[in-house]
């Protein structure tokens, strides 16, 4: 799948991810000179003093949530604001509060992982992250971050998803009748058996598990588990289950973050559902295919998608 990564979220250097364990996050005392105001879910007011940052990682839970504790292997959805604190000056670098919530999955900056693991869903967390817990002495020139810059994060934790999260609705079909058959147990990757028949010429959307959640709308951040296979060979070429964490994207974004078949086939589906998408080349990777994934230009693709959440 096409993926758009937040450049400030992922450690682009070869630094280790030094995460805390379950329970309350371990860190030094919060920096009293950085203050955060405003309600959960709204863009925060952040005051950063006109002086140099301290050298240690400092974390403060500004708003205490009452939801589940975020575990080390969880993916989680949140809103964030990021400031670059450079010497005695600072500036807002990125914010999702004016756009869409983001799925935090995979490797985070070491300091951010230390700050967020062990927090409860519904919390607002302030993290002042020194270079050693961010991008190191090299910085991140592409993002305008120098090796001496401190990063200030404010993160609202909206929802967490365990690594084995799956569809939660009512089973209505296993496919078949000219379409692939799908079998699996709850919390496990679906198994796809492709028939020997020719694939459909047009996009097919088949609900396998009917969820009871809200319908997906264009522009939302959608969180899913998925398996993708090639019709011709039945070979699985991609799966979020193998990576051990769900996948998040903005549906019907411009430019698109996923293949057209996903944008077309998932809008209107209910959260909690498992949906099979049979995607012809025109709604997949087009005339160029995707050689890295072993997809030829004329290949029809089969996806089984578990819709875990949709967020505006």
Where are these regions (language model features)?
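Cross-family detector of peptidyl-prolyl cis-trans isomerase
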Residues: 2-312
């Amino acid at each position: 799948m096409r993926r758009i990564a937040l450049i400030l979220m992922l450690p682009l250097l070869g630094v280790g991810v030094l995460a805390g364990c379950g329970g309350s996050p371990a860190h030094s005392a919060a920096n009293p000179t950085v203050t955060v105001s405003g309600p959960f879910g709204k863009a925060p007011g952040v005051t950063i003093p006109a002086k140099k940052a301290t050298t240690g990682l400092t974390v403060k839970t500004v708003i205490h949530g009452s939801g589940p504790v975020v575990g080390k292997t969880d993916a989680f959805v949140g809103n964030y604001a990021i400031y670059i604190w450079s010497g005695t000056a600072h500036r807002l670098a990125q914010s999702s509060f004016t756009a869409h919530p983001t799925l935090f999955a995979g490797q985070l900056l070491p300091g951010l992982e230390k700050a967020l693991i062990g927090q409860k869903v519904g919390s607002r967390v302030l993290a002042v992250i020194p270079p050693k817990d961010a991008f190191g002495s090299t910085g991140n020139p592409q993002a305008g971050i120098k090796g001496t810059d401190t990063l200030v994060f404010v993160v609202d934790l909206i929802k967490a998803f365990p690594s084995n999260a799956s569809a939660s609705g009512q089973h209505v079909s296993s496919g078949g009748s000219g379409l692939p058959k799908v079998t699996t147990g709850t919390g496990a990757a679906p198994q796809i058996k492709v028939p020997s028949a020719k694939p459909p010429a047009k996009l097919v959307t088949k609900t396998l598990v009917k969820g009871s959640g809200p319908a997906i709308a264009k522009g939302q951040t959608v969180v899913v588990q998925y398996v993708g296979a090639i019709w011709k060979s039945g070979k699985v070429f991609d799966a979020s289950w193998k990576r051990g964490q769900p996948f998040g994207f903005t549906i019907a974004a411009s430019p698109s973050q996923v293949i057209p078949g996903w944008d077309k086939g998932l809008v209107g589906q209910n959260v909690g559902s498992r949906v099979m998408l049979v995607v012809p080349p025109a709604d997949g990777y087009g005339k160029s295919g995707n050689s890295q994934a072993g997809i030829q230009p004329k290949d029809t693709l089969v996806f089984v998608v578990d819709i875990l959440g949709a967020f505006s």
